Amino acid sequence: MNKIISNKIINNNIIFRNNFNNLFFIRNFINNKNNNNNNNNNNNNNNNNNNRNKKLKYSPNHQWIKISENKDFATIGITNYVSDIVNNEFNKILKIKLPKINDKIRLNQPFLSIWTKEEENIQFKSPLSGIVSKVNNKFNNQQTTTISTKTTTTTTKIKPKLPLKSNSLFFNNDQDSWTIELKINEPFQTNHLMTEEEYAHYCENTDYK
């Protein structure tokens, strides 16, 4: 993981900027690349594309979004790209805080806060508006473990970590990687969200094919 990414955290509310911050440029680049590939290779399909989750969208602040088929719920999680950075490049995560069930969340409202020793508060902004219907409590605060012997009882704090399932940029939609579920109660647009291919270029992942 590129260590200079951590230096791109700007202020305390803007997270993980990178050089590919112009989504219009990325989409034009991908369209041109795909057109060239189609012209040169009409009969060759990339098998990897068949295995990718076309239903997931990605936000500029490194969250994945899965919208239900009837479009009334959205599950939101953190991608491996940013999870790996936070886990490996910050010495200590002090606290992780999520909203409560029934909280109203607006588009671009900070809803997930991570306090670290180096950065006072890293915040993730919501990619959609809605009402919190579920919360993944595995993200909330520190946990403790207690070990008892015949003579002593020791309570140890477990260092909080963001879930990381693979070396991929992307999270699978599993029980550990999601943060909240939103009940969507108003019309919404997804033009500001990225496909997997767009997100890979946004993260400057040259290995994506």
Swiss-Prot record:
UniProt feature, compositional bias: Low complexity: 35-51
Domain called Lipoyl-binding: residue spans: 73-159
InterPro entries the record matches: Biotin_lipoyl, GCV_H, GCV_H/Fam206, Single_hybrid_motif
Disulfide-linked positions: none
GO CC terms: glycine cleavage complex; mitochondrion
Region feature Disordered, mapped onto this chain: 35-56
A Pfam family the protein falls into: GCV_H
A GO biological process held by the record: glycine decarboxylation via glycine cleavage system
Source domain of life: Eukaryota
Regions that span the bilayer: none
Stated family: Belongs to the GcvH family.
Annotated protein name in UniProt: Glycine cleavage system H-like protein gcvH4
Species in which this protein is naturally found: Dictyostelium discoideum
Protein's gene: gcvH4
